[in-house]
Amino acid sequence: MKHQTEKPSEKIMRFFTPELYLQFNSPDEAVADRADEAWEKAIHKYQRHLQSIRPKLPSQVKEVAELSLHDAEVLAFEREMQPGFPLSKTPVPFPIWYAFASLSLKQNQTILSLLYILGDHIQEYPAKEDWQFSRSDTHWLYDEVDLDLNHQGMFLHRILFSDGRIFEIPFMSVVVSRFSLPATDEAGTAKRIA
């Protein structure tokens, strides 16, 4: 899939921008304090926005919007696009294709997978040049769920990761799958259940 990078990052995330996150973590106490106030306002604005679109969200999209995945470890992010009906002998007036994305995360002792049926290409935006946080061991920072105003019946999931990248996922549907890892002892050995 093509990765597009034409938007500046503050135009992608509407509420929890990378710029605000950098200011929030500033060593300058005055900057961090101002950012803390701005962050609280962003939380309230996003909650109001989410409340305003909630009646238009199907249950599975509401479930994603209600997840709290901050600091979850990103295990895998797979994307696949396929032609829709390669064996069809009947010509169609427009290209038919389907695409899926799977985002797997570990949060505490739970593995969580978000399985998206995509409505368009996922757009990946690189970290800002001044991104000062680690680019290894990627973790989920903040996300925003929104309506895709350009495509009726579609939704957007924007995610800011700890390496500074932002993904904008246009999707038609999503499934959340969870399973718990076995409990471990202090040495990290899985405890027997039976």
Specify the residue positions occupied by each region the protein language model found.
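Surface-exposed, interaction-prone regions used to assemble/regulate multi-protein complexes
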Residues: 1-194
